[in-house]
Amino acid sequence: MKLAPHLHRLGNDIVAAYLIDLPEGITLVDAGLPGHWNDLQHELSALGKSVADIRGLILTHGDSDHIGFAERLRQAGVPVFIHAADAHRVRTGEKPKTAMGPARIWPLLGFFGYGLRKNALRTRHVREVIEVADGDVLDLPGAPVIVGMPGHSPGSVAVHVPIAEAVFVGDALTTRHVLTGREGAQPAPFTDDTDQALSSLDRLTGLEASWVLPGHGAPWRGAPADVVAAVRGAD
């Protein structure tokens, strides 16, 4: 789905990934669930493009609902980038257990049902990745800037792409709680260190963007500082 010039979304408010389309090629941010491969093909076809036009995939972190088709892309020759602190997680799936937190039955069933329909149980770990660090500017379409956002995981990042006026935040925050169905900017569930995650939000406030794009929930149309204020004000 086209959001704006150069900017497209795969998936929906339950699980989303993003595509930046420029004349020099395509940059992907996150890889959703394995079944989002078909969504990717449809979006590429609508653009008159193919997997051969994808120059790189940046993962905001290493959780399974963000790496769905990453290994498939890697095997097709697309480099996969992730923060060094999440490289082990994306290669092995090993992560600390976190409390699930509040949940409501219908949103919970919707989340897991969507995962099953999108082949979540078939997610493959990514065998080879290129490790990145806070402040790196990647040689990919849009010159994406890596912004370290530790908390949800040690290697969680945001990805700032000025030409698209967008910052992709992964699970640094959410605009729809996948377990309760509550909408609006708020902390994301399944977070390793909630205090650190909230502290990391300060790193977004100075970024210039008109889109804040989470891995779960509707796109936020407005300044990063405004969404950070909304998260901090959430009950």
Predicted regions and their residues:
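Conserved beta-strand hairpin/beta-sheet module of binuclear metal-dependent hydrolase folds
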Residues: 1-47, 51, 158-174
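Metallo-beta-lactamase
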Residues: 33-35, 121-127, 137-139, 143-150, ...
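Residue-level marker for buried hydrophobic side chains located in beta-strands
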Residues: 27-29, 58, 80, 166-168, ...
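Short, structured coil segments at secondary-structure junctions
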Residues: 3, 75-76, 208
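Short alpha-helical
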Residues: 15, 35, 64-65, 88, ...
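Active-site HxH/HxHxD metal-binding segment of metal-dependent hydrolases
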Residues: 45-130
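Short, electropositive alpha-helical surface patch
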Residues: 221-235
